[in-house]
């Protein structure tokens, strides 16, 4: 079983003309459920949120949840699928619930706008979800094996450094991480282990639906590493492949069981050899 901690938010995409209930927490939960993983989901929400989650229990027999009462339905609005969202209420006006305390063997945790938490577990994957004063895991959690997944801005904010050697020292020696992954959008990601670095490719897709792509990378990585027992390197590569399929088709696939993979790796163009007008 995997315990997922994260938000359940409303997402409005004007380009796709859609209003959906997802958020990082529930989208991660959805990926795991679609791949037959037993999931306990810890989130916040109002009566409508609880009704929505109960409806999903009718579809997924392996799904349980714990929902802390919260009046607001936090909303992310996108003008198009590559847009940065507008968040309502404003970040400064979002009230917080009492601290959530979760103890579980296996955890995938996403930073939440409306809640802080205390975590204790064996294997934990942590995604801070914000470059604005992201929480350090050492401030609220204990794990036997910890993997951070974050982007460049989040890594800089947590470590207060742009130097990769300082960043590595911080995560390995101060945060006691087993590994960390720094995502770089279309340029893929880098998996940092104590003894090596592994470039994780991105893939060329026919469609690019960016909304939720980071959630899928984190949740699928946790699935491959925790549930399927793959190595950190194989988990990261398969997470990137699952993300590519999600961005193209909005489906949740376990790529580790596929006989073939249809997408080509993206190679960064060498702009220094091009003439710019």
Task: Describe the predicted segments one by one.
Residues 1-16, 259-273:
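Positively charged, low-complexity intrinsically disordered leader regions
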Residues 2-4, 9-19, 31-109, 114-123:
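Conserved N-terminal subdomain of the carbohydrate kinase-like
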Residues 6, 43-45, 128, 150, ...:
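Short beta-strand/turn micro-motifs composed of small residues
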Residues 32, 151, 214-215:
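Short, conserved phosphate/pyrophosphate- and ester-handling motifs at nucleotide-, phospho-/glycolipid
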Residues 15-19, 159-163, 212:
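Short, solvent-exposed loop/turn segments at secondary-structure boundaries
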Residues 106-170, 188:
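Conserved beta-alpha-beta core of the PfkB/ribokinase-like small-molecule kinase fold
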Residues 24-31:
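Short amphipathic alpha-helix
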Residues 134, 166-277:
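Conserved phosphate-binding/catalytic region of the ribokinase-like
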């Amino acid at each position: 079983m995997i315990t997922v901690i994260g938000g359940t938010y409303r997402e409005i995409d004007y380009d796709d003309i859609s209003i959906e209930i997802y958020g990082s927490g529930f989208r991660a939960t959805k990926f795991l459920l679609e791949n037959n993983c037993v999931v306990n989901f810890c989130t916040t929400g109002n009566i409508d949120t609880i009704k929505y989650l109960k409806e999903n229990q009718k579809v997924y027999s392996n799904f349980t949840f714990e929902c802390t009462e919260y009046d607001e339905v936090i909303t992310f609005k996108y003008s198009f699928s590559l847009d940065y969202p507008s968040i309502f209420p404003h970040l400064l006006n979002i009230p917080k619930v009492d601290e959530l305390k979760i103890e579980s063997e296996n955890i995938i945790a996403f930073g939440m706008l409306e809640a802080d938490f205390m975590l204790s577990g064996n294997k934990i994957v942590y995604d801070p979800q914000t470059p604005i004063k992201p929480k350090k895991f050492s401030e609220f959690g204990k794990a036997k094996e910890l993997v951070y997944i974050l982007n460049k801005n989040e890594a800089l904010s947590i470590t207060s450094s742009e130097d990769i050697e300082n960043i590595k020292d911080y995560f390995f020696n101060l945060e006691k991480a087993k590994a960390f992954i720094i995502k770089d959008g279309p340029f893929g990601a880098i998996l940092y282990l104590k003894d090596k670095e592994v470039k994780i490719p991105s893939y060329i897709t026919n469609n690019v639906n960016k909304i939720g792509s980071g959630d899928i990378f984190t949740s699928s990585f946790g699935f491959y590493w925790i549930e399927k027992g793959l190595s950190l390197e194989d988990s990261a590569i398969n997470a990137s492949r699952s993300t590519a399929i999600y961005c193209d088709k909005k489906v949740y696939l376990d790529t580790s069981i596929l006989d073939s993979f249809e997408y080509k790796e993206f190679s960064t163009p060498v702009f220094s050899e091009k003439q710019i007008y």
